[in-house]
């Protein structure tokens, strides 16, 4: 039976990555993108995360607690331009792409292992390299037999070399270890209801 496999391609700290693409000196620095002087933090570099800056932190609080961090006002036209570059790169390799946000897309890789004569993990690596080289944006890729099971490992991919795959024989274990709050599509109210009924994973 044909193996069905979906990739979730997720741009890393997308707004910050766009700022670093146009201003390379920002790479390796603690950088945050904020929604204006009276707004809040909407994107953080890895260094800013390590420093302790939280997503959604009000600008006045972030500047007070983390004065050494570089703060950039959001530039949505810039991010849309880079989003188009990323999606164009992805579509040059994978015909079936579903954009779900400015920095995220599902790609159906089913049977493309035979087209490119490689395994799916290597194909994901090729996608990452192409996007990084052409669009100058780093991405992480989760691989799984469905959209849900591609979404779950995409966060793990950020800490495991950029790619993480869930294989069919590990699905049960992965779901058992996944908190309900981490499952895409289950909102806070449903999560509370399930917890009330003793369902946590």
PLM feature spans:
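Gly/Gly-Pro- and Ser/Thr-rich, intrinsically disordered tail segments characteristic of DNA damage-repair
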Residues: 1-201
């Amino acid at each position: 039976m044909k193996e069905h496999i979906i990739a979730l391609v997720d741009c890393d700290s997308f707004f910050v990555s766009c700022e670093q693409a146009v201003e390379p000196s920002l790479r390796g620095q603690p950088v945050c993108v904020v929604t204006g002087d009276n707004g809040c933090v909407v994107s953080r570099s890895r260094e800013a995360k390590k420093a302790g800056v939280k997503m959604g932190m009000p600008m006045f609080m972030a500047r007070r607690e983390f004065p050494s961090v570089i703060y950039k006002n959001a530039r949505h036209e810039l991010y849309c331009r880079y989003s188009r570059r990323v999606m164009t790169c992805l579509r040059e390799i994978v015909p079936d792409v579903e954009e779900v946000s400015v920095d995220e897309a599902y790609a159906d890789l089913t049977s493309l292992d035979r087209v490119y004569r490689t395994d799916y993990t290597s194909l994901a690596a090729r996608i990452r390299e192409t996007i990084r080289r052409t669009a100058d944006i780093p991405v992480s890729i989760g691989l799984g037999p469905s959209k849900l099971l591609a979404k779950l490992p995409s966060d793990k991919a950020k800490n495991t070399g950029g790619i993480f795959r869930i294989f069919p024989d590990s699905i049960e274990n992965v779901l058992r270890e996944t908190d309900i709050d981490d499952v895409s599509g289950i909102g806070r109210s449903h999560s509370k209801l399930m917890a009330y009924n003793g369902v946590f994973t």
